[in-house]
């Protein structure tokens, strides 16, 4: 019973950290990264479809993305979706390929992005702490139901705390790396 609670807590904490990594992958850091386009969807045959499912996205140069749609008729729609997105990119098209030149980030924009990065890290820390609280509540319930002894529950709560500390430290590390990447000129 206690092991189930600990395993579930760890699985949920891992998912919280993975979600943060995915979120950070979509944040623009002055370098071309195909993941920047993950959140952009295009109305395609009546369905909102992610750009990465409509085209081949490649990085020919460190500051350029090329988007080559498999269906050429989707090219103008992809272009429009990129313009509407909050990425601040201007697509240029030659009729078969869309080129996205990634401009150098201004100091002001870097600061804004770092604030976003910190907020997302804080949201992840809160999620991990909420998982800790839920796990501790489940452990107390086991003790109350006499399914586990007080000592076992105390030990398990210590394990949950160690786990929480480990994942919060991991979130801090990921945030620091992303922050450094953004502030790099």
Curated annotation (Swiss-Prot):
Name the domain of life this protein comes from: Bacteria
Q: Where is the signal peptide?
A: none
Q: Name one GO cellular component term.
A: cytoplasm
Localization, per the record, is:
Cytoplasm
One biological-process term from Gene Ontology? translational termination
**What is any Pfam family matched here?**
RRF
Which stretches does the entry tag as region Disordered? 137-158
Task: Indicate whether Secreted appears among the record's keywords.
Answer: no
Any idea which UniProt keywords this protein has? Cytoplasm, Protein biosynthesis
Family matches, as CDD domains: RRF
Q: Which InterPro entries match?
A: Ribosome_recyc_fac, Ribosome_recyc_fac_dom, RRF_sf
| Gene Ontology MF: a single term | ribosomal large subunit binding
Stored PANTHER family: MITOCHONDRIAL RIBOSOME RECYCLING FACTOR PSEUDO 1 (PTHR20982:SF3), RIBOSOME RECYCLING FACTOR (PTHR20982)
Report the family membership: Belongs to the RRF family.
Q: What does this protein do?
A: Responsible for the release of ribosomes from messenger RNA at the termination of protein biosynthesis. May increase the efficiency of translation by recycling ribosomes from one round of translation to another.
Any idea what this protein is called?
Ribosome-recycling factor
The top of its lineage is:
Bacteria, Bacillati, Bacillota, Clostridia, Eubacteriales
Name of the coding gene:
frr
């Amino acid at each position: 019973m206690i092991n189930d609670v600990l395993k579930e807590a760890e699985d949920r904490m891992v998912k919280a950290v993975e979600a943060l990594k995915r979120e950070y992958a979509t944040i623009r850091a002055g370098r071309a990264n195909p993941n920047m386009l993950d959140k952009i969807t295009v109305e395609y045959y009546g369905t909102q479809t992610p750009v990465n499912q409509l085209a081949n996205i490649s990085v020919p140069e460190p500051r350029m993305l090329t988007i080559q749609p498999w269906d050429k008729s989707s090219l103008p729609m992809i272009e429009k979706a990129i313009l509407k997105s909050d990425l601040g990119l201007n697509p240029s098209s030659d009729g078969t390929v869309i080129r996205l030149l990634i401009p150098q980030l201004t100091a002001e924009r870097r600061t804004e992005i770092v604030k976003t990065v910190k907020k997302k890290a804080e949201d992840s820390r809160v999620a991990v702490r909420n998982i800790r609280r839920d796990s501790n509540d489940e452990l107390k319930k086991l003790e109350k139901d006499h399914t586990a002894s007080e000592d076992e529950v105390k030990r398990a709560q210590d394990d949950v705390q160690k786990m929480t500390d480990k994942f919060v430290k991991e979130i801090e590390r990921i945030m620091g790396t992303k922050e450094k990447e953004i502030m790099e000129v």
